Amino acid sequence: KLKNFAKGVAQSLLNKASCKLSGQC
C-alpha cells in the first residue's frame, strides 16, 4: 500500500513538473 501511495505522489509531482515545463498549467 505504501509503495502504491508513493507511486501516486511521484506521478502527480511529475505531472505538475511537466505541466510547468510545457507552460500548460
Swiss-Prot record:
GO terms for biological process: autophagy; defense response. It is found in: Secreted. Disulfide bonds join 19-25. Expressed by the skin glands. The keyword Secreted applies. The keyword Disulfide bond applies. It comes from the Eukaryota. Keywords: Amphibian defense peptide, Autophagy, Disulfide bond, Secreted. It holds the Pfam family Antimicrobial_2. InterPro entries: Antimicrobial_frog_2 (IPR012521). GO terms for cellular component: extracellular region. Belongs to the frog skin active peptide (FSAP) family. Brevinin subfamily. Cytotoxic to cancer cells, acts via the activation of the lysosomal-mitochondrial death pathway and autophagy-like cell death. Does not show significant hemolytic activity. This is Brevinin-2R. It comes from Pelophylax ridibundus. The lineage of its organism: Eukaryota, Metazoa, Chordata, Craniata, Vertebrata.
